[in-house]
Amino acid sequence: MNIFAAFEERIGEALASLTRAGQLPEGLDLGRVVVEPPRDPSHGDLATNAALVLAKEARTNPKALAERLAAELRSDPRVTEASVAGPGFLNLRLAPQVYGDVVRAALRAGEAFGRGAKQPGLVNVEYVSANPTGPMHVGHGRGAVFGDALANLLVAAGREVVREYYINDAGAQVDVLARSAFLRYREALGEEIGTIPEGLYPGDYLKPVGAMLAKTHGRSLLGKPEAEWLPLVREAAIGAMMERIREDLAALGIRHDVFFSERTLQEGGKEGGEGGAVARLIEALRARDLVYVGRLPPPKGQLPEDWEDRDQTLFRSTAFGDDIDRPLLKSDGSYTYFASDIAYHASKVERGATELIDVLGADHGGYVKRMQAAVRAVSDGRASLDVKLCQLVRLLRGGEPVKMSKRAGEFVTLREVIDEVGRDPVRFMMLYRKNDATLDFDLAKVVEQSKDNPVFYVQYAHARTASVFRQAREAFPGEDLSAEALAGADLSLLTDSGEAEIMRLIAQYPRVVESAGSAHEPHRLAFYLYELASAFHSFWNKGKDLPQLRFVNQTDRMSTLSRLALVAALRGVLASGLGILGVTAPDEMR
């Protein structure tokens, strides 16, 4: 039961009634009409912008239109007050039984409460896609958690989702990985390697790869030229790094449906030549006159060292909203990263995706326009791309920066953080700030048992709901406390302002799932859960001072059952929301 969607429909009916009465023209576009909680709860339960967005089209004054709508809605038995505020906002106050109906609906729907109806189209969410050249760091962890929670959120909102990881296994960086692993192979055979040469990957994480190569090949690789050992070592090193990455992701509860290898885009053909997926893609674009040979103007400001004033093979990305056309081939004839990226996103479209979401690091800001243009081109406008950039994570301990990891060589690994504080704090706190804002992750604060630690505060609320039911079973042995039985309780007894606040927030849950999913912003759900937990803890504390407001009262069975119905509905929402974020909902805090 989504009261916001229900009242959007009701406002549509009211507008239709005014149209039939000749007070409004026909064919008004209701696409921008929104029903949402008012910014100030004292103004009512619902607010709508209907009059503001429709007044011009209706050729009337926003305030006058709002007054007409208010008059129509006052006859609705669910509405106790309809008032106009400001330039034409319409605020509605609802009858208490509306919230009682929401609690009953939540109890009867169980896990389905707040979930959206199935929607058409396939969403491809690509996240993590860390280069297989070393351990994952906490920045990778933020993108991993964001992407996984977003995928969960979209599923909850009714979307079909494919979760994808792009393995960057075709670039120069994997050759550097192979040379770094070969150095560790020589070390494993007893050679003194000294300081790691500049340009190779430092850190101890490649030592096991070197040991594995030594065990498998003995000394047989030492006398071979690089051209012979490099492909073999590269394959082994990529495999070992991807195995480690998968283990780290599993420790964080992250899963993917597809691991897509960049190398497969070039299989069957030579770089810059015929046969591979990238080459076929370029030829298909050329056939549509979207590829040409030309010269790019020099970039503004200081010229990059690698900029060349020469004829280049260019993609007409400006035809699809980009700032400049983009090169597809390097001066040596090999593909640019952009060319491979176009082919990769074309593959997503070919596999049925109509909505593409890429979760990337903040350093990919320049990537957005060109890839959105590319997706429009390869899909003929049938697919869209949203790029979500995750800002940096500053790792702190008690407010002080954390030193680098010796094992990784230059950063603290994600696994080190998970092992220290646990999966739940990592996941929740990575989502408790909008993705495009820098995140301070304090290893000391995320394990504190206080209101200032959001993950503890929300999980503690769920644990408290479980303790309420343990008390209730002791106080009322034999009483049917199932959700179905509690849905029959007299919810008109829930008259305290604290109870009303909890019911108001429960009613918002379906809208939060829907809006957070459509905006691709899982932090909205994390914020909502903290607000809901706060309302519950506040009412719990109120009962300490006022015994008549306690959840379980042995001398008042009726009010106890009413409050248990409220607690059961709240517990279901907390568990559902935490589940979407990938965080456990404990019955006891340990």
From Swiss-Prot:
Keywords per UniProt: Aminoacyl-tRNA synthetase, ATP-binding, Cytoplasm, Ligase, Nucleotide-binding, Protein biosynthesis
Top-rank taxon: Bacteria
InterPro entries assigned: aa-tRNA-synth_I_CS, Arg-tRNA-ligase, Arg-tRNA-synth_N, Arg-tRNA-synth_N_sf, ArgRS_core, DALR_anticod-bd, Rossmann-like_a/b/a_fold, tRNAsynth_Ia_anticodon-bd
Enzyme class: ligase
Keyword Cytoplasm: yes
Cellular component terms (Gene Ontology): cytoplasm
Keyword Aminoacyl-tRNA synthetase: yes
Entries under Gene3D superfamilies matching the protein: Arginyl tRNA synthetase N-terminal domain, HUPs, Isoleucyl-tRNA Synthetase, Domain 1
Biological process annotations from GO: arginyl-tRNA aminoacylation
Predominant location category: cytoplasm
PROSITE patterns, per the entry: AA_TRNA_LIGASE_I
GO MF: arginine-tRNA ligase activity; ATP binding
Motif 'HIGH' region location, chain numbering: 130-140
Enzyme Commission number(s) of this protein: 6.1.1.19
Pfam families in the cross-refs: Arg_tRNA_synt_N, DALR_1, tRNA-synt_1d
Location(s) in or outside the cell: Cytoplasm
CDD domains in alphabetical order: ArgRS_core (cd00671)
UniProt catalytic activity: tRNA(Arg) + L-arginine + ATP = L-arginyl-tRNA(Arg) + AMP + diphosphate
Subunit structure: Monomer.
NCBIfam families with a match to the protein in the record: argS
Family: Belongs to the class-I aminoacyl-tRNA synthetase family.
Protein name, as recorded: Arginine--tRNA ligase
